[in-house]
Design a protein with these regions (language model features):
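Interfacial segments of alpha-helical transmembrane regions
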Residues: 63-94
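Hydrophobic alpha-helical transmembrane segments of integral membrane proteins
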Residues: 85-107, 166-187
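Hydrophobic alpha-helical transmembrane segments
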Residues: 52-71, 131-134, 142-143
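Aromatic-anchored segments of alpha-helical transmembrane domains
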Residues: 17-23, 88-94, 157-169
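Alpha-helical membrane-inserting segments
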Residues: 28, 44, 90, 94, ...
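Membrane-embedded catalytic cores of phosphoryl/pyrophosphoryl-handling enzymes
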Residues: 118-218
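Membrane-helix interface segments
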Residues: 43, 75-80, 108, 146-152
Length: 218
């Protein structure tokens, strides 16, 4: 059973993040200079770089723990988490395709702002942010099976996205779009795949039941 509160929350998040991306697009350069430049001069520059580079691992660990827990305790929720995992892969693939189509250069490559992290090589495009896409996808995958974890996974996803801007490798609209993409695709694919598997399983079970065999004469 999918928690009812998750779907409206996910939709609201997608709409809010999309609006944030649209609003910040016109001021992307000044925002980048303020955030990335300020972070590079801040005593917290090292922390921003660490979260930007390795913060995604925390969400991976939480998701892995949920995989083990649901496999042992609740196979139905494990199935939903597995379907959401497929959605995460689809979200990442979509992000990569969009990157290649749009080919937006990294802000650290076109600007003159000192950044916390080294700028990725040419051809490693900026929009949307892959890290943010995966962060949003993993967060919503966890929330589909364990909504009480929102106080942990939502701040983590936002921290990863924000740190990518602070570290100087993305614009604000890059990470907002990435989060929205990860949440939307993972939610849609995960729920659709899980619902499809459940329908097939129910049909298969009903055909093998004694009542069904007596009805069909088998």
């Amino acid at each position: 059973m999918v928690p009812r509160a998750v779907l409206p929350a996910a939709l609201s998040a997608v709409l809010g993040l999309s609006a944030l991306a649209a609003v910040t697009w016109p001021a992307r350069e000044s925002l980048f200079e303020q955030v990335a430049g300020g972070a590079a001069r801040s005593p917290l520059a090292g922390l921003a770089g660490l979260v930007a580079d390795k913060g995604l691992l925390a969400l991976v660990v939480i998701t892995a723990c949920l995989v083990v827990f649901t496999w042992r305790r609740d196979r139905s929720r494990f199935g939903l988490l597995a379907a959401a995992g497929l959605g995460t892969l689809c979200a990442y693939g979509t992000s990569e395709v969009v990157k290649l189509m749009v080919a937006q250069e990294r802000p650290c490559r076109v600007g003159e702002v000192a950044t916390v992290l080294d700028c990725p090589p040419p051809g490693d495009w900026s929009w949307p942010s892959n890290h943010s896409t995966i962060a949003g996808a993993l967060a919503v995958a966890c929330l589909l099976v364990a909504p009480r974890l929102w106080l942990m996974v939502v701040p983590l996803a936002l921290a990863v996205a924000g740190a990518r801007v602070a570290a100087g490798v993305h614009h604000v609209h890059d990470v907002a779009s990435g989060l929205a993409l990860g949440v939307l695709v993972t939610c849609l694919v995960g729920l659709c795949v899980h619902a499809g598997v459940q329908r097939v399983t129910r049909r298969s079970t009903s055909r093998r039941s004694p009542e069904a065999r007596r009805t069909t004469g088998r």
